[in-house]
């Protein structure tokens, strides 16, 4: 998809001031749109963000990735736990074995490293194999003991980009028609902690069924109402059909 100006701002704000910035790795090799309309290589962007080394993984060698690998398969042992940032800027939807792509992202991250997935959510028919639901990322990385799980719904319409914070654990479900005619993406991040077990993460059970049938305690209804009314419900129609989202 390339890294848009809005995506660059989301990456920078997510990185913030915390965490080491030694090595970053990306899925795919992408061009980055700048504010003055130019394009730069992704290595320049991540270098500006403080990373000393920027590596990449791709299936084909054409764009000169650092590692020519198939993300449908487990990544080699010598790459595991080595990266302070793992950035998937729209590769996962093109891989048939999407769960393994997420496992690989988790495996590549170092302790205290950050994983970011920026992938299609709605209105991307036939762009790749899949469009994704927010609960997939919260349930997978939650089950893998990652922390600081955050997501923004990223709206793209021509040259206008905007976003809304969203958390399926406390917010009510997003309407199926979210975004109207705009393209909608998930911008999700999670941090790997020392408590994350070594080896490949397992398969999660979807959160709604863990609470309905598995005895897991759900977030209280009052908390849902409070959070939802503050962030989503009060302006649902406006926000999802053209107004109220934060402009990038």
PLM-predicted stretches and their roles:
Residues 3-6, 159, 238:
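A short alpha-helical cap/connector motif
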Residues 122, 128-155, 162-166:
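Conserved Class I S-adenosyl-L-methionine
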Residues 123-128, 174-178:
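Active-site rim elements
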Residues 22-31, 36-124, 135:
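Conserved SAM-binding loop
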Residues 210-248:
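Membrane-proximal basic amphipathic "stem/tether" segments
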Residues 10, 136-140, 189:
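Amphipathic alpha-helical segments that form well-ordered structural scaffolds
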Residues 1-22:
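Class I SAM-dependent methyltransferase Rossmann-like catalytic core
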Residues 158-223:
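Flexible, glycine-/basic-rich loop-and-beta segments that form/coincide
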């Amino acid at each position: 998809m390339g890294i848009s100006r809005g995506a660059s701002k989301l990456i920078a704000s997510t990185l913030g001031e915390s965490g080491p910035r030694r090595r970053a790795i990306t899925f795919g090799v992408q061009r980055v749109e700048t504010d003055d309309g130019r394009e730069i290589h992704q290595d320049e962007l991540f270098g500006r963000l403080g990373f000393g080394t920027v590596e990449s993984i791709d299936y084909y060698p054409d764009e000169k990735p650092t590692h020519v690998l198939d993300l449908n398969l487990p990544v080699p042992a010598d790459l595991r736990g080595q990266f302070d940032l793992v950035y998937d800027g729209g590769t996962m939807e093109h891989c048939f074995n999407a769960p393994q792509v997420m496992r690989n992202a988790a495996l590549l991250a170092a302790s205290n490293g950050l994983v970011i997935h920026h992938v299609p959510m709605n209105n991307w028919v036939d762009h790749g194999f899949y469009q994704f639901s927010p609960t997939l990322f919260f349930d997978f990385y939650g089950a893998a003991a990652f922390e600081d799980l955050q997501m923004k719904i990223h709206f793209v319409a021509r040259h206008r980009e905007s976003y809304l914070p969203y958390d399926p654990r406390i917010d009510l479900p997003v309407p199926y028609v979210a975004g109207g005619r705009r393209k909608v993406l998930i911008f999700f991040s999670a941090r790997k902690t020392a408590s994350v077990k070594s080896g490949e993460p397992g398969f999660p059970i979807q959160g709604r069924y863990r609470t309905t049938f598995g005895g897991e305690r759900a977030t209280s209804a009052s908390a849902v109402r409070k959070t939802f009314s503050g962030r989503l419900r009060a302006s649902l129609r406006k926000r999802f059909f053209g107004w109220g989202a934060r402009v990038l």
